[in-house]
Swiss-Prot record:
The keyword Ribosomal protein applies. Residues 9-18 have a biased composition (Basic residues). GO terms for biological process: translation. It comes from Lactobacillus delbrueckii subsp. bulgaricus (strain ATCC 11842 / DSM 20081 / BCRC 10696 / JCM 1002 / NBRC 13953 / NCIMB 11778 / NCTC 12712 / WDCM 00102 / Lb 14). This is Small ribosomal subunit protein uS12. The modification 3-methylthioaspartic acid is found at residue 102. The lineage of its organism: Bacteria, Bacillati, Bacillota, Bacilli, Lactobacillales. Gene3D superfamilies: Nucleic acid-binding proteins.
Amino acid sequence: MPTINQLVRKGRHSKTTKSKSPALNYSYNSMKKEQVFNPAPQMRGVATRVGTMTPKKPNSALRKYARVRLSNLTEVTAYIPGEGHNLQEHSVVLIRGGRVKDLPGVRYHIVRGALDTAGVDGRKQARSKYGAKKG
């Protein structure tokens, strides 16, 4: 336990929390050719690779993912939610934060129904999460 004099001299430091989606915290200034701190809720990117991945130990599946080069020039791995998708290389996608617990290294989700990503066909419930139209 610090003495009062030590607290007067140094003070207490508050803990800094690390971002769970660091790629969304920076944008790219092409004039200065540097990344600028500018947090955003979503970000646009181009899919450089689309494939499947197997989840961690107790689960078994082929989870769909895309490697995306964002507009701030960072490359991230993003999960494609829902059943079936129309994504391929060079598709323009919208990325949001949110990890997939059983896929290591996947910290982002692709927003369905935005830009080149189509919504899920025949979806009746939770339609807004999958970009599905009514009817």
